[in-house]
């Protein structure tokens, strides 16, 4: 799930697949 970094309260990291787009994922 693609989420907003600010809205994310859990662990945030940039996924390798969305690295070039800078998509933030929560796990």
From Swiss-Prot:
Single biological process term from Gene Ontology: carbohydrate catabolic process
Note on how the cofactor is bound: Divalent metal cations. Maximum activity was observed with Mg(2+).
Reactions performed catalytically: D-fructose + ATP = D-fructose 6-phosphate + ADP + H(+)
pH dependence: Optimum pH is 6.5-7.5.
Domain of life: Bacteria
Induction: Induced by sucrose.
Summary of subunit composition and partner proteins: Homodimer.
Family statement drawn from the similarity comment of this UniProt entry: Belongs to the ROK (NagC/XylR) family.
Protein name as it appears in the record: Fructokinase
Lineage of the organism: Bacteria, Fusobacteriati, Fusobacteriota, Fusobacteriia, Fusobacteriales
């Amino acid at each position: 799930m693609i989420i907003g970094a600010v809205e994310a309260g859990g662990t945030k990291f940039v996924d390798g697949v969305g690295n070039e787009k800078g998509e933030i994922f929560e796990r």
